[in-house]
Amino acid sequence: MAAIVFRRRDHVINVFIMPHVSGPMRRQELRRNGYNIESWSDGEYDFWAVSDLNRDELDMLTKLLGA
C-alpha cells in the first residue's frame, strides 16, 4: 500500500493506493465521522481519498487523479 498526502488550504487529503484484489469495484462516496471518503479502481489499483474537505472539492481532486 502507498499513501499520497495533498493539502488544500487548511485541509489534508490522504489518498491510499493498493493493488486491486478481485472483482469489480464501483466508485463510492461515503461520509464517516466528518470525513468524506471516495473510492475507485482502475482495474489494477484501488484508490481511497479521505479528507474533511467538502465533497465537491474532493470530487474535483479524485477526477484529476483518474476516478
Task: Please state what every model-predicted region is.
Residues 1-67:
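Polar, acidic low-complexity tracts enriched in Ser/Thr/Gln/Glu with frequent Gly/Pro and Thr-Pro motifs
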